[in-house]
Amino acid sequence: MIGKLKGSIEEIGADYVLVDVHGVCYVAYCSARTLSKIGSVGEAVVLFIETYVREDQLKLFGFVSALEREWFNLLQSVQGVGSKVALAVLSTLSPSELANAIALQDKTMISRAPGIGPKVAVRLVTELRNKAPAFAGDASASIGLKQELGEGVASAPVADAVSALTNLGYSRDQAANAVAAALKNGGEGGDSAKLIRLGLKELSR
């Protein structure tokens, strides 16, 4: 089984990269996010690999980090999510954004990925909410917000407040941190408008 490829980029396609490793070229299917990060033809590349072996085919999937590869596998543990849909999710959301969305039970965020309908989005945020922290990577904001909310799922006002702050130009992590601080400082039980106001106050400090 192939776990990692180190070589040079021979070709980049719409959904794959051809990697030359000492004269042997490997096709690795990747998310759009990965393809945007690996560089140009002729440059050196290192990819973490997930190998799929079927009766009639062998496919390699490439990732820029081991964390992204773990998310690829975790996503496919949910019914209705195969390799193609998992790559679409990782093309749309970074691992930290994905961890945030699951911690916040943000189905709308998940549904931005092609191939993810409402039912699959619900299954993703429900089935992965207890697994996501282990795969959060640098998504400390989502973990902090989840701790403020306790073991329950994020309320609609919380998700709306985070979404509103990101629409104002703040990063997902900044928004989640601000809402977590707002909840801690007296915003618990408030509506989205109150959380947005308190969140903006936190961000202005």
Swiss-Prot record:
Gene3D superfamilies for this protein: 5' to 3' exonuclease, C-terminal subdomain, DNA helicase RuvA subunit, C-terminal domain, Nucleic acid-binding proteins
Entry-linked CDD domains: UBA_RuvA_C (cd14332)
Tree of life domain: Bacteria
Region: Domain II, residue numbers: 65-143
BP term (GO), one: DNA recombination
Region (Domain I): 1-64
Keywords: Cytoplasm, DNA damage, DNA recombination, DNA repair, DNA-binding
Keyword DNA repair: yes
GO cellular component: cytoplasm; Holliday junction helicase complex; Holliday junction resolvase complex
GO molecular function: ATP binding; four-way junction DNA binding; four-way junction helicase activity
UniProt region (Flexible linker), positions on chain: 144-153
Segments of this protein annotated with the region Domain III: 153-205
Compartments, as annotated in UniProt: Cytoplasm
InterPro entries, per the entry: DNA_helicase_Holl-junc_RuvA_I (IPR013849), NA-bd_OB-fold (IPR012340), RuvA (IPR000085), RuvA_2-like (IPR010994), RuvA_C (IPR011114), RuvA_C_sf (IPR036267)
Pfam families with a match to the protein in the record: HHH_5 (PF14520), RuvA_C (PF07499), RuvA_N (PF01330)
Main location: cytoplasm
Keyword presence, Membrane: no
Domain description: Has three domains with a flexible linker between the domains II and III and assumes an 'L' shape. Domain III is highly mobile and contacts RuvB.
Main function: The RuvA-RuvB-RuvC complex processes Holliday junction (HJ) DNA during genetic recombination and DNA repair, while the RuvA-RuvB complex plays an important role in the rescue of blocked DNA replication forks via replication fork reversal (RFR). RuvA specifically binds to HJ cruciform DNA, conferring on it an open structure. The RuvB hexamer acts as an ATP-dependent pump, pulling dsDNA into and through the RuvAB complex. HJ branch migration allows RuvC to scan DNA until it finds its consensus sequence, where it cleaves and resolves the cruciform DNA.
Family: Belongs to the RuvA family.
Oligomeric form and interacting partners: Homotetramer. Forms an RuvA(8)-RuvB(12)-Holliday junction (HJ) complex. HJ DNA is sandwiched between 2 RuvA tetramers; dsDNA enters through RuvA and exits via RuvB. An RuvB hexamer assembles on each DNA strand where it exits the tetramer. Each RuvB hexamer is contacted by two RuvA subunits (via domain III) on 2 adjacent RuvB subunits; this complex drives branch migration. In the full resolvosome a probable DNA-RuvA(4)-RuvB(12)-RuvC(2) complex forms which resolves the HJ.
Protein name in the entry: Holliday junction branch migration complex subunit RuvA
Organism, scientific name: Agrobacterium fabrum (strain C58 / ATCC 33970) (Agrobacterium tumefaciens (strain C58))
